[in-house]
Amino acid sequence: DIVVFEHPYIPAEYSSALAFLSKLVSKLKKVKTVLIIHDLNSIRLGNLTISKEIKQINSYDAVICHNDLMKSFLQQNGCTKKLINLWLFDYIVKGEKETIQKADYDIVIAGNLSIEKSGYIYSLKKVSSLKFALYGIGVMEEKLGGNISYMGSFSPDILPLKIEGRWGLVWDGDSIDRCIGDNGEYLKINNPHKLSLYLSSGIPVIVWNKSAIAFIVNHYQLGISVSSIKEAEHIIKHISEEKYQEICDNIQIFKERIVSG
């Protein structure tokens, strides 16, 4: 038998207790424990040491991590368990999105829009030739530029059916020039659920070229990877409709897998 656990456990203070429970379970005959990593809070939040988090992770027989870069990070910091790459998270969607002939917005940004995680949204007024649509919580609407519309917040299960835009942006930090700070560093090893959100909605993506997901996006031609949002602006303005449609066709293959689990 296999027992699957998730990491980090919510509430976080129970993660150590859960790791202890996994040790007890693993001692049962013919029972193996598997851990699915959603986030590494030692990097994302800095609310515990890397060594303590690795100790929790080492309590399981096998670990499902995001990608090769996260796998290397875990091994370099003392993870001794079998590591398996997930690559992309599922994003189960019930229902079909209404077909939009021509999206009113160039770029959609969904998720945690707090100033700590997404402070860059208040600099998007400098990218005045593009129109942005924001979905999520933590927005200070009065500080947004005239080219930015706040569309509200929706539950994760219906969000893919609500968002509209020609491109979905995966970006963190307070700069439009690059992803910086702890959240920016985390993108170098993390596969954000946001990527699966956009793909489940059939939207091509824009990602930072130093992020872990840039490899997937480039290899399977699911969007573009850029050094800055200004660079994205230039590409979007010059990409042909034929090339854009080719990317959309590539996404459909992944969408079918992601939304069905």
Residue ranges, per PLM feature:
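A short acidic/histidine/glycine-rich donor-binding loop in glycosyltransferase catalytic cores
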Residues: 220-226
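Nucleotide-sugar-dependent
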Residues: 163-201, 207-215
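Histidine-centered beta-alpha loop that forms part of the nucleotide-sugar donor binding/catalytic region
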Residues: 7-8, 37-40, 68, 86-90, ...
